[in-house]
Amino acid sequence: LVLTQHKYSAILLLVSTFGGLVLNGVLKLGFNRPRPAIFLPEVHTVSSSFPSGHAMNAAIVYGTVAYLAARLHKRLWARALVMTAALIVIVLICVSRLYLGVHYPSDVIAGVAIGLAWAGFCMATLEAIQKFGARRDPKILEQEKPAPGGPPV
């Protein structure tokens, strides 16, 4: 992203991803919920169960990447395709956490909800900075301008 002059997009991806990792660690320490008693013997875990880090990080990373990719597409079908692909990956990761028995369903649901909330906050912050920022570089803003019709809903 930096090499293609999408500086703000690169910053958004970094802040949302690493901020999400920190947020997940703080929440795991705060709740310290034990994992389910029954899970596959070859699965080794070292952290607490709530919230699911995999689900949370999947929602953050794939949600943010889908948002950034959809901003660049002009056609509605392309935006829908990007969002659908991200949703499928997130759901598959969530199902894998339940299949392996390393999380309760509430851990996974909370992980996705918190991840989407954090990613949404980061995306809204990017939009506000680009719209109202005092130090705006016109060249960068033009390159990162959303496709006509605004960001996907």
Spans of model-derived segments:
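Hydrophobic alpha-helical bundle signature of multipass membrane enzymes
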Residues: L1-S48, T64-R71, V82-T84
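Membrane-embedded catalytic cores of phosphoryl/pyrophosphoryl-handling enzymes
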Residues: A37-V153
